[in-house]
Amino acid sequence: DLEKSNLINPSDDAYFVSYGGLDHALHSKIIRVDEFAGYWEYVLDQAIYTSPPHPQWGGAAIFNGRGHVIGIGSLFLHEVFEGQSQQGNLAIPTHLLEPALNDLLEFGRPLTPARPWIGMYTTETGGELIVSSLARYGPAELAGILQGDQIMSIGEEKTSTLAHFFRSVWNLGSAGVSVPLQINREGNELKFVINSADRNDFLLKPKTH
């Protein structure tokens, strides 16, 4: 059975069950349920944070104490939470998976309009958004964005957090939409227009005959 994340509470027990049966299961604790933004243009409105971490977290099923599946293991994290350094896992809540599950099983991806992808890996440091690297031949690199650029705004909309920045890009439309970006480069304010793309077009795919 799947259980919605609105029934998940911090400090609840969580059981990571990976391949290998009980010998590879781990009793863990839910630290919090919160938003997550990843530098690779990725945002979860809700993510399940657990600790201690499971060493084989990828694709592991996370059960609660009632035996319901509440999430799927996705990441290993090393972060500072409430002033303390902490290792743990991030799991995708099952209720976020359910609407796309049939498409994923049949096609490997949701059959919804692709979000605009700009190929820019961004980190949030000291309240600033900094370009840490670029996808080779990706839209941002082709537009002239450089590693170390500071993102100031999308059009006239100031960016505040990594999640806010990505959502602002996605709110412009689907893949192919132009993304007006203002950056700070060594004290100079510069404006660029990035022609976004569908990330899937840049992925290696199986060859068919």
Predicted features by range, described:
Residues 54-58, 137-138, 177:
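Short, small/polar residue-rich loop motifs at catalytic or cofactor-binding pockets
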Residues 1, 26-87, 116, 124, ...:
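Active-site region of chymotrypsin-like
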Residues 2, 8-10, 63, 145, ...:
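Short, well-ordered loop/turn sites that connect or cap secondary structure elements
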Residues 8-15, 62, 151, 179:
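Generic structural signal for buried aliphatic residues
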Residues 15-16, 21-23, 65, 69-125, ...:
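C-terminal cap/linker of serine protease catalytic domains
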Residues 2-25, 188:
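Short glycine/Trp-rich loop-beta-loop segment that forms part of the substrate-binding cleft
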Residues 66-70, 140-163:
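Conserved PDZ fold ligand-binding element
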Residues 103-109, 130, 143-146, 152-154, ...:
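PDZ-domain C-terminal substructure recognizer with occasional recognition of PDZ-binding tails
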